[in-house]
Swiss-Prot record:
One of its GO terms (cellular component) is plasma membrane. The keyword Signal does not apply. The keyword Ribonucleoprotein does not apply. The chain crosses the membrane at residues 25-47, 66-86, 97-117, 130-164, 241-261, 304-324, 351-371, 390-410, 448-468, 476-496. This is Na(+)/H(+) antiporter NhaB. Keywords: Antiport, Cell inner membrane, Cell membrane, Ion transport, Membrane, Sodium, Sodium transport, Transmembrane, Transmembrane helix, Transport. Na(+)/H(+) antiporter that extrudes sodium in exchange for external protons. Pfam families: NhaB. InterPro entries: Na+/H+_antiporter_NhaB (IPR004671).
Length: 528
């Protein structure tokens, strides 16, 4: 039967996505202009829900295409303007540069990171200790590198482990070329492979939560942290100190949760590394050590020095995050002899699709701001006073961040709170406390779903997710114990007065100074 033109168009539309998903996107595109004509506010919220739906269906179709079509239509029908979208991207240029350059920069340090994490896996046999190592090291790295960068590193490590095992288990040597995405090799033991997949899922989830535990602590840990720090006019050290009354107890609670879920093997955790797989990875490690040349050792040494520069540059805020990432690319490639254009291009493959998706997301933010979708929630939260106001903002941010990306939740909230400060509705000291509540509220409960955490979405849409059978639902289930513990400990730190009391102590000991409202007027308020 010949294929009709309409059938060919539908087949090509969104490629191999399920037919029901294609029809859903088409129906969204038809419905939105009609609803917008009658009620722009409802149409705006409908668009937000539809965009969240495309994020939730990330394994069916990468969200850039369906989300991008919704964003293009939103601009075309007047929900927002191209200039407002451009303004949002300009206001968040540091985040874009971070994604483009920092993630690519870490690509050229993956030999060192693969070396370190391979040693962790092969030298430490206790699954509980390995899990704690991955969680804590991810948290430490996220405090300096940005959570997205760290999860990109862990993904690289996991793909490395998986491909090594898959290659050898398929009857090939370490040096042979091999397609590790195909399971059609008769030598593979299905039970062993499933156990290894479960082991890698565990480590990736512990590492992912670790990035949230460390990422909330510093201004470079998460994209929205940079935005919040810029609005509040805080530098690296001040940001970390102000967050500490909430982030320190949350960190220890998170590490304890990691220990408990592994110890009691609940929520899909406790998967052991099969002995045969451990032997393959140990043999690979020994093979690499034996065949490591002077040139290879120099490369590892160079990458270690660049790592020191990276941490020092970020901690001392010597340049913007993206520019430090660019310096990492230049130093790593120059001193490791990578001068081929195609070799350079591979470093950008992982980050650029997500960067494009982030630009689409900023178009949705522009709609939220232009149609004032969050205004009722903000005004309701501001109607409370003192410590209760902090708790309300934490919970309101947390609930929204669970279902929508925490970057735009944090961006919208900090802008609205800053506007309230400039309008005289709140004091500067209360603004600073609210900024802490917003930052922790967007970072901690958002581990609930991949929609909230950019690093989790990055993991869900990465090459490793289908290999280890890490689906959206499975991520939500495995994140659940962390979601409950981190959210509750965070809200208790605010509710019981620890945030206000410790902040006052920091003022008294002059670790912090009181800012004036005037200090924030120089920074750009995104979306206004």
């Amino acid at each position: 039967m010949p294929v009709t033109m309409s059938r060919a168009i539908l087949d090509n539309f969104l490629g191999n996505s399920p037919k029901w998903f294609k029809l859903a996107i088409i129906s969204f595109l038809v419905i939105n202009p009609i609803v917008f004509y009658f009620n722009p506010f409802i149409a705006g919220w409908l668009l937000v829900v539809e965009f969240i739906f495309t994020l939730a269906m990330a394994l069916k179709c990468y969200p850039l295409q369906p989300g991008g079509l919704l964003a293009i239509e939103a601009v075309a029908i007047g929900m927002t303007s191209p200039s407002q979208v451009l303004h949002e991207i300009e206001a968040n240029l540091e985040v874009v540069l971070l994604l483009v350059f920092m993630v690519a920069g870490i690509y050229f340090m993956k030999q060192l990171l693969l070396f370190v994490f391979t040693k962790m896996i092969t030298k430490v046999r206790s699954k509980v200790y390995v899990s704690l190592l991955f969680c804590v090291s991810s948290a430490f790295l996220s405090a300096f590198l940005d959570a997205l960068t760290v999860i990109a590193v862990i993904i690289t490590v996991a793909v490395g482990f998986y491909s090594i095992y898959h290659r050898v288990a398929s009857g090939k040597s370490f040096a042979d070329s091999h397609d590790h995405t195909s399971d059609g090799h008769p030598q593979l033991c299905e039970e062993e492979l499933e156990s290894f997949r479960g082991f890698l899922r565990n480590l990736l989830m512990h590492a992912g939560v670790g990035t949230a535990l460390g990422g909330v602590c510093t201004m470079v840990g998460e994209p929205q942290n940079l935005i919040i720090a810029a609005q509040a006019n805080w530098q690296f050290a001040e940001f970390a100190i102000r967050m500490s009354p909430v982030t320190v107890p949350v960190f220890f609670a998170g590490v304890t949760t990691c220990f408990l879920v592994e110890k009691f093997k609940v929520f899909g955790y406790g998967q052991q590394l099969p002995e045969a797989v451990h032997k393959i990875l140990s043999d690979y490690d020994a093979h690499e050590d034996a065949n490591r040349t002077k040139h290879d050792k120099v490369k590892l040494l160079v990458q270690a020095f660049i790592g020191v520069w990276l941490i020092a540059g970020l901690a001392l805020h010597l340049a913007s995050v993206g520019l430090i990432g660019l310096s990492v690319i230049i130093l790593a490639t120059a001193f490791n002899g990578i001068t081929n254009e195609h070799a350079l291009g591979k470093a950008f493959e992982e980050a650029l699709p997500f960067t494009a998706l982030l630009a689409v997301f900023f178009a949705i933010v522009a709609v939220i701001i232009d149609l004032q979708l969050f205004a009722p929630v903000i005004q309701w939260a501001l109607s409370y006073e003192g410590n209760t106001q902090l708790v309300v903002f934490y919970i309101a941010n947390g609930l929204l961040s669970m279902v929508s990306d925490n970057v735009f939740v944090g961006t919208v909230y900090i802008n609205e709170v800053k506007a309230a400060l400039l309008n005289g509705q709140i004091t500067r000291d209360q603004f600073d406390l609210l900024a802490v509540a917003i930052n922790t509220g967007t970072n901690l409960p958002s581990v609930a779903t991949p929609n909230g955490q950019a690093a989790f979405l990055f993991l869900l849409t990465s090459a490793i997710a289908p290999l280890i059978r890490l689906s959206y639902g499975r991520m939500v289930w495995m994140a659940l114990p962390y979601t409950i513990v981190l959210s509750i400990v965070g809200v208790l730190a605010i509710q019981l007065g620890a945030l206000e009391q410790m902040t006052q102590y920091f003022y008294d000991t002059q670790l912090l100074i009181h800012h004036s409202a005037q200090a924030v007027t120089d920074s750009v308020v995104s979306g206004h």
